[in-house]
Structure formats: C-alpha cells, structure tokens
Amino acid sequence: MVVPKVGINGFGRIGRIVFRNAIEHEGVDIVAVNDPFIEVHYAAYMLKYDSTHGRFNGTVEFDGNTLIVNGKKIKFYAERDPAQIPWSETGAEYVVESTGVFTKQEKASLHLKGGAKKVIISAPSSDSPMFVMGVNNDQYTKDITVLSNASCTTNCLAPLAKVINDKFGIVEGLMTTVHSYTATQKVVDGPSNKDWRGGRTAAQNIIPSSTGAAKAVGKVIPSLNGKLTGMSMRVPTSNVSVVDLTARLEKAATYDEIKQAVKEASEGPLKGVLGYTEDDVVSSDLNGDPHSSIFDAKAGIALNSNFVKLVSWYDNEWGYSRRVIDLIAYIAQVDAQ
C-alpha cells in the first residue's frame, strides 16, 4: 500500500482535526504544516489541547521550527504565499488546503509551485472538481491536480441521498441542517455586513443561515442536479450537526423499507461512511464519530409512502476530517497505478 506524504496548509479547526485523524488513520504520513499566523510552540499547544475533542492521545513537543508528535518530526512553516511553501523539502506530495481562503483553482494550485503534486481543498470549491467518499470518488482520475472534499454537510447528505435515490428515486427534496456554531460566528453581537443575522451571539441564538450543501449534492450525484436545495439553522452547540432531508419519492416505500435500505448500505458499500443507529441518541453522543453521516432510524417520519423526512447526524469536524484523509489515501492509490 502506498502511504502518501502529506502537508497541511492552515492549522485551524479542520487543519488540526485532519492532523489528529491522520495520526489515527496510519494510511497517510503528515510531514509538514504551514500556518503564518501561529508560532510552532503555540501550534503544539493547540494540537495538544482541544475543548471539543479532548487532549491529544500521545506526545506533542517542539524544537525550533519542528513539531515533534509521538517522537516523529514534522516541519512547521510560516509562509503567507502558498507558492512559497517549500513542500518538496519534506517530500509532501499531497497538500490539504484548510485555510478556508484559497478555495479556487487558481490560488490552490499555487501549492504546486512548491513541489506539491495534488491539492485537496477542505471546503467547497466553485471551480474545482468535488469528491464525496462513497458517492463519486470513483470518478477521480490521475490528471486532476486540485480537488475539493466538498463541505461537511454535503458529506452527510450525499451518501444518504445516494441510497434513497438509487433505491426509490428522489423527485425533489428540501434539506435543513441544524448546525453547530463555527469559528466564523460571534461570541457576542458584532458587525457582520454580509450576513446581519450571522453577527449575533452564537451561544444565545438559533440563527437561520444559507448553505450550498444541498445544491452541491447535484454536482456529485448528477441525476439529483436541480432537485435539492436547503438552508441552515446555526444553534448553540459547539460540535455535531444534523441533516433533516424532506423528500418526495418516485417509488412508493414504507418507512421500514427505507430503514432497511440505509442499514444494508451502511453494512455494505457505504460501510465507514454511512452509519446507522436505532438508539435514542442526542448530538453529544456523536462527538468524535468518524462516519460522514449517521442515519437516525427513530427520528425520521413518513407522511405517506411517497413523502418522507429523514434524519442523519454528523460530527462536522471529526467525520469530515476523516474523509479528507480517506480521500487522500484513495487518490494516492489511484495515482500509483
């Protein structure tokens, strides 16, 4: 098995959780990190302690411009310009672009100048191909140099939508994600010119917001293009979100038949990506769950045999970051063939 050497640009929430997942995963080798806004000793502290996911399970130290994690040395750079990051020094061929800034092809491809061969954007991209593991990763070809792992919400919705669409057909659907607050929101009311509601206190409000996650499913499942759209409700929880998909089906189905289809997929072709539970779970029970999507069999309802509401949980940090690593491991195997 090929173990790709990986660099991470941007050591924020996703960058650090991708790092933690990579250490657990063992299918990739993190060799370098770049972040111009934090120094190496602070990066070590932020990796070691996490309010949501707890202490790092291992040792974290630093020496000069090097992070030392479980005894392994990882080069730490502080370049603002992606083109200036010397990825080739460490042999990092696959770069996770997790700054949230360089989401377009032109900017993300600057990493190639420093020696990277592939760039994986950990956010939706308007002009780069998007891949969702378990849904359309088989469409990846070696000639693609910049790709997107889509969003955490698309990663939750797409596997569920795929199962339902393949088995029963989706005529149309509306999605609401009840989404934990994120770093872009405010601790207290503050200015937010583009999104006035988004400037209100995150921990005190339910905040309606927009999301392109449902429409993006149409990019990874072309047969659903134009059939899905959705919105978001930002709520006062720090992590774990839940998708509510209301869909009209082509083929009549009982709710039990839908449950069975999802359960079979979760144990078969989508194992590890799509989870299934009949337990009475609440959001904190899914903290640290590595699935993209965990179908809640008890939470959904059917109005009739063609109109259903389906509910699926996701750890919007941990599950998404695990898929970033899975995607890199997958494309590295394809590239090696």
From Swiss-Prot:
GO molecular function, one term: NAD binding
This enzyme's EC code(s): 1.2.1.12
Subcellular locations according to the entry: Cytoplasm
Principal place of residence: cytoplasm
Catalytic class of the enzyme: oxidoreductase
Sorted UniProt keywords: Cytoplasm, Glycolysis, NAD, Oxidoreductase
Pfam families, per database record: Gp_dh_C, Gp_dh_N
Family the entry assigns: Belongs to the glyceraldehyde-3-phosphate dehydrogenase family.
Subunit text: Homotetramer.
Name the UniProt record assigns to this protein: Glyceraldehyde-3-phosphate dehydrogenase
Gene giving rise to this polypeptide: GPD1
